[in-house]
């Protein structure tokens, strides 16, 4: 701060020209001075520009084909789900854009009278097949706030557990408490099949974690102004609330819906009992493909209430991943697992190679475990544990080679010393 005695010359702000007596503080730099008022003004300008740059620019709203191509670079397979999501997300934000611009007179005014309803999305499919990744990738592309909520932790208001408003708090926190930005975000509610009621008939007793949660979610799914406690937890009469309008929040709800395939098969005429029964194992790809024939009545029989189903007009599914898809997941996406582990080893100045039959063995192990793509990382950790323990302490290793035997027989990977690697660098088996 630059202040001088009363007898000296008055210093002035180099930006607004006010003297030191007209402002609270004057901060000195090399040959320049700035007052506290100019600093506040600069902060306001910077914050305004940052908020504008972080908002989704409606003029640059990506087309469905562009959204699909972006999803394709991160998610392997699931073409139908990617196409459905691309169209649904494009239409949703086009609707937000139309709602944000007021209608004019004449023909434009008549068009503005047509109110576009929100289309939330229900995503069905087995675990580890890309449901959460699809939602995360969409939010990353559109640069909108994104929150993931677990439906199993939710209970009806007044009971032990989380209120549904806590879902909205996660979205507000993802937007750095910028409510306006949060109001155009995406919320993914996982494990929604776990809040199904026990039968298709209405319950005569309180079902606080099932049907009660579905009832509590109805309003925020449809669009309402919700009161959210800023610190989470239960609502108290004397605390202040954050008001958020969920009209333009896109909800994607997902779940494995185990057993729903049998309900669909019984409706479309496929036998699930008897000598001619169509039997599916837990990891049979056909068991999830039947989700393509789903109807709202199947979800009703599963235990979802009609009002909840009605607020999820877009229904799509992901299918089980086969061997080829799992190998592609290991190698093709931008953040593929093989690339991640190669990078980890590069940080220790070591090359990591997987033979093609090693990748096939890893994919086969993931199918046997029945955990989909999530099982790939666990298998990779098991396979590479011993070398990840030794390599940081050794400077003589140039390359690590993982073969089929390493995956299936739990032998140690091949370590190639630096002097040997430099002599025969070009001669190696085809590897990833």
UniProtKB/Swiss-Prot annotation:
Q: Which SUPFAM superfamilies match?
A: Glucocorticoid receptor-like (DNA-binding domain), P-loop containing nucleoside triphosphate hydrolases
Question: For binding Zn(2+), which residues are annotated in this chain's numbering?
Answer: 13, 16, 35, 38
Q: Which Pfam families match?
A: AAA_2 (PF07724), ClpB_D2-small (PF10431), zf-C4_ClpX (PF06689)
Query: Would you tell me the protein name for this molecule?
Result: ATP-dependent Clp protease ATP-binding subunit ClpX
Example GO molecular function:
ATP hydrolysis activity
**Which species does the entry assign this protein to?**
Frankia alni (strain DSM 45986 / CECT 9034 / ACN14a)
GO BP field: cell division; proteolysis involved in protein catabolic process
Question: Which CDD domains does the record associate with it?
Answer: RecA-like_ClpX (cd19497)
The family database entries (InterPro entries) matched by this protein are listed as: AAA+_ATPase, ATP-dep_Clp_protease_ClpX, ATPase_AAA_core, Clp_ATPase_C, Clp_protease_ATP-bd_su_ClpX, ClpX_bact, P-loop_NTPase, Znf_CppX_C4
Q: Which UniProt keywords apply?
A: ATP-binding, Chaperone, Metal-binding, Nucleotide-binding, Zinc
